[in-house]
Each structure stands twice: as C-alpha cells, then as structure tokens.
C-alpha cells in the first residue's frame, strides 16, 4: 500500500486545500490528512483558529476521498510519521521555511520517504 500523508491547520477549508488533497490522493492509494489541534495552532501561530479542531476535521471528512483524518499536536511530526509509515509526504511550499526542519528532513531521507512540496 502506498500511503500519502499531508498535514496542516485547514482553518476554513478552501480551494487551495482541496486541490492539494486531491492531487495528494492521486499519488497513492491511501490518503491520511493530519489536522493540527487547536492548542498546537495557538502555541505555534500565536492565534486561535477560526474553526475548532472538530469542525476542521469534519470539513476534511466531508470531502469523501480522504481515507483517514488524524489530529496531531506536535509541530515535529516524526513520531506521527513513524506510526503511519507513509511512502510520500505532501506539504505546502511554506513547509521548509517554517520552524526548525533539519531533523524532519533527516528523518525523511533516512526513511526513504518522498517529500513533495506544493503540488
């Protein structure tokens, strides 16, 4: 099984989010969308999301083509990736420029995971 994982806040799901998720789904046969929890968003962005975690999760589920939706609260997603074991990680183009990513990139390389930025 080729698992594809993508993650984000998804605060007010928009066409850009839907396009990324649609394209990510085409890359494998199982799409996991990870939604950042409210407290984690507040801690990292210093602002609360407009929609709460449950509302954002329900929007993703309502799309009907995402196979699994997981809530995460750690900015460092290596532990999450270790549990899901994705073949491909899809991120927005801001991924490399937001926070310390050296260890995450090392993890991706060491585990032979394909990283795709901005589909």
List the predicted regions and their residue ranges.
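Nucleotidyltransferase catalytic core that binds NTPs
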Residues: 1-119
């Amino acid at each position: 099984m080729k698992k594809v994982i993508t993650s984000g806040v998804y605060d007010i799901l928009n066409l850009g989010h839907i396009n990324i998720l649609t394209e990510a789904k085409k890359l494998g046969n199982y799409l996991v969308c990870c939604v950042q929890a409210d407290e984690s968003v507040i801690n990292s962005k210093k602002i609360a999301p407009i929609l709460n975690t449950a509302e954002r999760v329900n929007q993703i589920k309502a799309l009907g083509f995402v196979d699994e939706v997981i809530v995460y609260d750690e900015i460092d997603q290596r532990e999450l990736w270790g549990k899901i074991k994705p073949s491909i990680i899809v991120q927005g183009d801001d991924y490399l420029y937001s926070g310390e990513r050296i260890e995450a990139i090392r993890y991706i390389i060491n585990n032979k995971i394909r990283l795709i930025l901005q589909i």
